[in-house]
Amino acid sequence: MSESNLSSFISTNYFNLRSAANSSNSISKPSTKKSIRNQKSPTNISSWALKKKTLQIAETTWENNEKDSTHSHYLMTGSMASRTATSLSRYSTNASLLGPSIDCVLCCIYEVPRDISTRIGLCIINCNTGQMYLSDFMDSQIYIRVVHKLQIYQPTEILIPSSSLAPTVSKLATMIKFNVAETVKIEEGSRKCFNSQDGLAAITKYLMDDTKKDLKIEEIIDKTFALCAASAAISYMEEIISKSSRNLNAFRKLRIQFEGTENTMLIDSKTVRGLELVENKLDKNGISLWKFLDTTSTKMGQRSLRNSILQPLTDRGSIEMRLEALEELKANDDLLQKLRLEMKSLPDLDKLFSRLLCINHSAIKPDQRINYVLLLKETLQSVKSLKDALNDQLIQSRLISETKKIFNNDAIMEIEKLINSCINEDCVWASSAIQLLNQRSYAVKSDSNGLLDVSRQIYKEVKEEFFREVEDLTAKNKINLDHNYDSARGFYLRIKRQEFTDDVATLPDVFISRTIKKNYIECTTLNIIKKNARLKEVMEEILLLSEETVDELLDKIATHISELFMIAEAVAILDLVCSFTYNLKENNYTIPIFTNNLLIRDSRHPLLEKVLKNFVPNTISSTKHSSSLQIITGCNMSGKSVYLKQVALICIMAQMGSGIPALYGSFPVFKRLHARVCNDSMELTSSNFGFEMKEMAYFLDDINTETLLILDELGRGSSIADGFCVSLAVTEHLLRTEATVFLSTHFQDIPKIMSKKPAVSHLHMDAVLLNDNSVKMNYQLTQKSVAIENSGIRVVKKIFNPDIIAEAYNIHSLLKIAKARTENEDSNGVVDQKTINQMKRIHNLVAILKECAGNEKEPLTLGKLKEINSDFIENFEE
């Protein structure tokens, strides 16, 4: 199979096997870039706001639910006539309550352009969920971490200091320009807006009051660059809200979190795109690792999965806590199914709870606050079901035990008591306009307000008068009258057309505002119009009195906001590990362990194994002393690129805390991952080679012993002489860094030269020459390099004219003769190489024995020792 068609093949075939529901999870970004406007520096925050389109945050509107009385009016997509009839779903929650599905994210980046160092302060505010993330770090010369953060959070608007744009555009501003979509607005602010003291004051103001508040302030007090970014971001947000408060959520508190760079793996943006971690390169709706692994039940879990893919864990203890949870859930299938089923009923908790952070609950329209309370109550009941499911089990894993502890928090019962003290317990979701009317009228308990009881009695009397009016009109005019209600007209009359066959003009004059519909004739009377006016007045009084009670209730619930967000985070992590466990069982994955060496037995490509029959697994092995740098050679289309991507994807999955597609997996913890994988669809020229080398020169400085580096076709697109020299020099440098490196190359002399080094291993993708001179690919990695002469010519034999193929063979023969004349074989070199290979096998034996001795799950047995010994003796003399 052609490597260039790999992505499209996976996308086409995989979607034939998997439900199309997952296609809704894709995140698409336009490929074109936005140029930075080199505008005059503003003098204050206000001048920014005059130039920019305000952040788009939809208000929670519910009018559309009540416009057409001939249809069911859903507060959620799906009938909710009773709480137990249909569970809530993350896809069914009405977006008008929880806001738009695409988050509005503000990102403020602070730098000092003239400073030699590349220190960065970052502040990201999610305007839908009320979350703020702060970072302060030293970046590389090409700002890999900044671009990484932009890729993770996908901001809709970016703020940078005016000094980054004038008098000259800084390198950071240029990197931002080329790594965001054209829909992202890039704005500037004056230097005085970036003030660390103002930032600290703003954070103190917006930080939620809980037991960890002082610790959080202490954590960020010396992060001056992050505080500068926070100062400008919060000032900008407040300025925009003050100018357009109707369309924006005015948060009184924010969920503030400082994100260090030491606990997550750094994956540069080109690696993210090349490995197709979150988006397919060829088709934005195509398959990616994120979409493939996404079997989550909630929006929170889905976001957590994406973040885990882009930022795998580097803290070994945290990874092993997730793996421990996988072990427990794997052994308890009933619990796994019950938890996944219960979580499917949950709405987006981050967005739901964030509405309580807004000033005066402005994110919830007054006439919809009862609906919000009902959704909150429904959510807490689902959380209690999760709690009951966990309480019924003897939980051993630390991670699930912690979520169980959070679900047993007394705050849940206290919030339920508060709701039940104000809202009638039999109040449920409405499915029609008249039910909505009754719900608003009777949701609040009668003993909450004396005036409310009086208004309700009047409301009841007016409705009874209307019903009597309908009965009188029916009896007087000998017409079978029906009635209905919608929010625009109030009550009105309906006559079935099949029962009234006469002309509409023959109706008595008392019936006015006649409208002919498909099945009904709709009309009203003057008396009904008067009663509707009276009913509207009474309803306004009821709603006003009810709103006062509900507002007080929301204020009391908001005092438990910290506990509610703890619940949201607990659900997210529980959903994530349940998703990992589901994938583990469905895809026959194994749970990895973490040691000092990389050993993956019979590894499989997680996506390709699902669409290719008889996928050939390969064992991956890398130790520091004998094979830290592995050079892969082989024919074109022999599977080198697939193997290299496979290595990277499996390492990412392991550090996410997920199962892996292999029989066994032992991993070191990598803190950086850089991959440059071949894209055969792109034209390869010397200019591509120059760009490749220039880019590589930048991130070579970012490589250390904890880096995993994947290089596909090192030196591709280059001339033979120059490309070979540079590629060999790069390989030599990579060896000195002691990083874990997997690279493939078309320069056959590189492995010949480098394999004499103790830490270098040369592996080959096996292929067989058949009797008809065609080449059969076995896709199997071997240590024996068997070169098939003219393999490239044989692969394209059926494509070109026979005369061209014959000429190619002739040229190859001439080049082979010329090379033989100049080669000076050194027989001692053969002896030296054999000695080196034997030393490598000794190092490998030591590493394997240490691995087996430290593996508590698979104790070292006599039989296993004999197997290792036999394998070592058999291969030692090769």
UniProtKB/Swiss-Prot annotation:
One of its GO terms (molecular function) is mismatched DNA binding. Transmembrane segments: none annotated. It holds the Pfam family MutS_V. SUPFAM superfamilies: DNA repair protein MutS, domain II, DNA repair protein MutS, domain III, P-loop containing nucleoside triphosphate hydrolases. Keywords: ATP-binding, DNA-binding, Meiosis, Nucleotide-binding. PROSITE patterns: DNA_MISMATCH_REPAIR_2. Residues 22-41 are annotated as: Disordered. InterPro entries: DNA_mismatch_repair_Msh2, DNA_mismatch_repair_MutS_C, DNA_mismatch_repair_MutS_clamp, DNA_mismatch_repair_MutS_core, DNA_mismatch_repair_MutS_sf, DNA_mmatch_repair_MutS_con_dom, MutS, MutS_con_dom_sf. It comes from the Eukaryota. One of its GO terms (biological process) is reciprocal meiotic recombination. One of its GO terms (cellular component) is MutSgamma complex. ATP binds at G634, C635, N636, M637, S638, G639, K640, S641. Belongs to the DNA mismatch repair MutS family. Two distinct classes of crossovers have been demonstrated in budding yeast. Class I is MSH4/MSH5 dependent and exhibits crossover interference. Class II is MUS81/MMS4 dependent and exhibits no interference. Heterooligomer of MSH4 and MSH5. PANTHER family: DNA MISMATCH REPAIR PROTEIN MUTS FAMILY MEMBER, MUTS PROTEIN HOMOLOG 4. Involved in meiotic recombination. Facilitate crossovers between homologs during meiosis. This is MutS protein homolog 4. The lineage of its organism: Eukaryota, Fungi, Dikarya, Ascomycota, Saccharomycotina.
